[in-house]
């Protein structure tokens, strides 16, 4: 079976990108007779004594009138070895955003350089953009070598300069080829003009370049696009989740987790356009059926239980600014489109602007203008499910949309989570002399979430007493109590709350590992906080139960056992959940407690949940 290679051309204006594509299409017999006749006639009308191959792809009237490429032109052609989709991108600096669009799906980029001019700023810019976009294969095509008499020294100088620049980028595969796109030398077949060049022709290289290893087949990521419920007599119980596999391989029977809620289940069936399939991999569009009835909607994601994306509202990214009449400034609000999820976001900060020529980081920059690149920090209103772009381009890329004009203003690539705390490589775990068999059975963690005053601590303490009366070792690990010691250094910003709950989660797993049944009353207002707690327990092999104390805000405020609501309403305290800080209701808690039942009844419901899971 022939494989498909997506490629794009890049480089400065008039370097010959459109001519090169025209040559590839013509020599591979991919130009229709009537189209070729039109190109020949237009060339004659302009007084050329040759056929202008650039006209094959320059389809807009403005392009033909000016002899330049403005929009991105996509063309398809094939050889016996491989199929190709090629994007002809513009070279003018004001159309850099178009180049980003054209190259965003490419697996290989051909960077054309006019041999007479050498490397120009725009050529460097495009090569750098290609590396940012995660493109692993670059071809340096030094064009118009015929105008320099096929000077080997000139070619070697340009090649060495480009390779020195590429060495500073994250690109491993760079191939340099001397060509003449107009005359076809070294484009489809090797040329007699370059006996000193021992490499392949351009087309031969495109046919043979290895791309099978570029796809991420390890990290299962399935963003849900649509929930299928036929509502017919024949399929009245059918529920499946449609989308495109972003990465990894899914098979029927696999254990998976639904994010951001963190529920685990199994795949029972996978359906493709023509019926059931044994497995699904990128870029297949399929629908997935699960063993359990879970509340899943567009924007959620299915992943492996022990291989999950980062769930966060705060992240750093490299962005390319594309707006003509606006600039990117910290504090501005935008819409983020990421996989199948669309959320509001704010630019929390601009770390630096990047000079693509020198790769210098200008930390004094206060804004990004058209075609400029920089590193920014973003905060979204609801969590996103992210991977680092270099690891997974599908879940590591996004666009920014202006909410006023609905126009795309930036393309972004998610960077590594530098805030994530990882142990030093010099820190080694100590193995206990006591084995798991010597200890009491592992305990469990019950995580109580809800607004302040919803009854979390009251129910948890009553459950603790009832369990101790039954001879079961139970302990209430109260988040407020930890703030008097271990977490005394933390405030109530979202970042500090996330760290507070991270520490709380790890302490809970240690207690549960000793055989205690741990009861954790903690507001944990965001879904990402609760998902993090569940993940920490899953990684430690500890059973985790989420209990939602579903007490309405007005009831909590009426109770106000600590007087905090009154202080929040008076403006004496800020970042108070339910007043000036959000609370995201759990979609699928393991247990929902409502105030229409007494505290004693609620405590018994929790105990019943634990006993049913034993």
Curated annotation (Swiss-Prot):
The keyword Lipid metabolism does not apply. Residues 2-217 form the tr-type G domain. Keywords: ATP-binding, GTP-binding, Kinase, Multifunctional enzyme, Nucleotide-binding, Nucleotidyltransferase, Transferase. It catalyses: sulfate + ATP + H(+) = adenosine 5'-phosphosulfate + diphosphate; adenosine 5'-phosphosulfate + ATP = 3'-phosphoadenylyl sulfate + ADP + H(+). Residues 587-597 have a biased composition (Basic and acidic residues). It holds the Pfam family GTP-eEF1A_C. This is Bifunctional enzyme CysN/CysC. It comes from Mycobacterium tuberculosis (strain ATCC 25618 / H37Rv). The lineage of its organism: Bacteria, Bacillati, Actinomycetota, Actinomycetes, Mycobacteriales.
């Amino acid at each position: 079976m022939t494989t498909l290679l997506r490629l794009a051309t890049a480089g400065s204006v008039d370097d010959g990108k459109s001519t090169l594509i025209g040559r590839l299409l013509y020599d591979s017999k991919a130009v229709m007779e009537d189209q070729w006749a039109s190109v020949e006639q237009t060339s004659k009308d302009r007084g050329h004594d040759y056929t202008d191959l650039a006209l094959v792809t320059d389809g807009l009237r403005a392009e033909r009138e000016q002899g330049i490429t403005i929009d991105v032109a996509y063309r398809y052609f094939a050889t016996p070895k491989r199929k190709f989709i090629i994007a002809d991108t513009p070279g003018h600096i004001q159309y850099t955003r178009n180049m980003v669009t054209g190259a965003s799906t490419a697996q290989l980029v051909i960077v054309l350089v006019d041999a007479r001019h050498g490397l120009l700023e725009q050529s460097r810019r495009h090569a750098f953009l290609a590396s940012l976009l995660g493109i692993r294969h670059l071809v340096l095509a030094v064009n118009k070598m015929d105008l320099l008499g096929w000077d080997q020294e000139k070619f070697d100088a340009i090649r060495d300069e480009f390779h020195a620049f590429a060495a500073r980028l994250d690109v491993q595969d760079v191939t340099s080829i001397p060509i003449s796109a107009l005359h076809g030398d070294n484009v489809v077949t090797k040329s007699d003009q370059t006996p000193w060049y021992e490499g392949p022709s351009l087309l031969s290289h495109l046919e043979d370049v290895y791309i099978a290893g570029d796809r991420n087949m390890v990290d299962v990521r399935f963003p849900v696009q649509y929930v299928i419920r036929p509502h017919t007599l024949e399929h009245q119980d059918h529920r499946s989740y449609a989308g495109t596999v972003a990465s990894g391989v899914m098979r029927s029977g696999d254990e998976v987790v639904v994010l951001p809620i963190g529920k685990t289940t199994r795949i029972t069936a996978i359906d493709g356009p023509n019926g059931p399939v044994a497995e699904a991999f990128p870029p297949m569009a399929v629908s997935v059926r699960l063993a359990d009835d879970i509340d899943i909607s567009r924007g959620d994601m299915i992943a492996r239980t022990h291989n999950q994306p980062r769930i966060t509202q705060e992240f750093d990214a490299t962005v390319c600014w594309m707006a003509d009449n606006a600039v990117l400034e910290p504090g501005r609000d935008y819409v983020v489109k990421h996989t199948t999820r669309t959320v509001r976001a704010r630019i929390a900060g601009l770390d630096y602007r990047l000079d693509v020529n020198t790769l210098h980081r200008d930390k004094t920059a206060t804004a990004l203008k058209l075609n400029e690149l920089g590193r920014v920090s973003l905060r979204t209103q609801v969590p996103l499910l992210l991977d680092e772009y270099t690891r997974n381009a599908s879940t590591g890329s996004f666009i920014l949309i202006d909410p006023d004009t609905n126009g795309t203003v930036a393309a972004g690539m998610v960077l590594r989570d530098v805030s994530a705390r990882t142990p030093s490589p010099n820190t080694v775990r100590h193995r206990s002399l006591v084995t798991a068999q010597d200890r009491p059975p592992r305990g469990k963690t019950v995580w109580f979430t809800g607004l302040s005053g919803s009854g979390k601590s009251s129910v948890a303490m009553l459950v603790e007493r009832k369990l101790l009366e039954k001879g079961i070792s139970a302990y209430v690990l109260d988040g407020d109590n930890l703030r008097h010691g271990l977490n005394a250094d933390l405030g109530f910003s979202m970042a500090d709350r996330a760290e507070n709950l991270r520490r709380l989660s790890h302490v809970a797993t240690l207690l549960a590992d000793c055989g205690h049944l741990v009861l954790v009353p903690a507001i944990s207002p965001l879904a990402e906080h609760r998902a993090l707690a569940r993940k920490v327990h899953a990684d430690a092999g500890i059973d985790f139960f989420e209990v939602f104390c579903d007490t309405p805000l007005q009831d909590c405020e009426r109770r106000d056992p600590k007087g905090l609501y009154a202080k929040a309403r008076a403006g004496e305290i800020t970042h108070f959940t339910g007043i000036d800080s959000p609370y995201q209701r759990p979609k699928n808690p393991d247990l929902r407690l409502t105030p229409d039942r007494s505290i004693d009844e609620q405590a018994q419901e929790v105990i019943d949940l634990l006993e049913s899971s034993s």
